[in-house]
Regions:
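Acyl-donor-binding surface of acyltransferase catalytic domains
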Residues: 1-9, 81
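Acetyl-CoA-dependent GNAT
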Residues: 11, 15-98, 109-111, 115, ...
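Glycine-rich phosphate-binding loop
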Residues: 99, 103
Length: 168
């Protein structure tokens, strides 16, 4: 007996809308506490990142993409200006558990890279954690290289932060 695989879940990417930043903060806090035991200081960091994005948003140089399927939030990512010249920073990649393995993360990262090139950036930098194995695989697949590691316990657990970079 053979079974046909169900068709892949379809999704679209869109730019952020009112209410998205609060939802991004909420989902990050819930998921990272559940999966990695991050404490409320992580939620505080995400709140600052999303608030800074809204306060300083430059549509010519920055974006936040939301992946969704029929209005259901599947994931998100941000690209923001870094302090370094001609460098963008990839922030807040997150894919809901139900959407993992469907290409959502790959599509979000590709959107960042494509936009960064169009905007004239020469590099994209990011900071991630060694425990985020799925995200790390996606970054490596997209051509990012790990350039530095730094142990920390900023969110109540021992972690290894990783700095990655992509030359465009």
């Amino acid at each position: 007996m053979t079974y046909d695989k169900p068709p892949p879940k379809q999704f679209t990417l869109r730019n952020h809308q009112p209410g998205d930043m609060g939802y991004i903060t909420h989902r990050h806090a819930i998921i990272y506490e559940k999966q990695y035991n991050f404490d409320s200081r992580f939620e505080s960091l995400i709140s600052r990142i999303t608030a800074d994005f809204l306060d300083n948003f430059n549509p010519d140089l920055e974006r936040c993409w939301i992946a969704e399927n029929n209005g259901e939030f599947l994931g998100c990512i941000m690209l923001v200006c870094d302090k370094k010249l001609k460098t963008a920073k990839l922030r807040l990649l997150m894919v809901e558990e139900s959407a993992r393995g469907l290409g959502v993360g790959t599509a979000l990262i590709k959107a960042c890279i494509d936009f960064a090139r169009e905007a004239g950036y020469e590099h994209i930098d990011l900071w991630t954690q060694s425990v985020l194995e799925g995200a790390r695989r996606l970054y490596a697949k997209a051509g990012f290289k790990m350039i530095e590691t730094q142990p920390h316990s900023d969110w109540g657990v021992d972690l290894v932060g990783e700095f990655w970079s992509l030359k465009l």
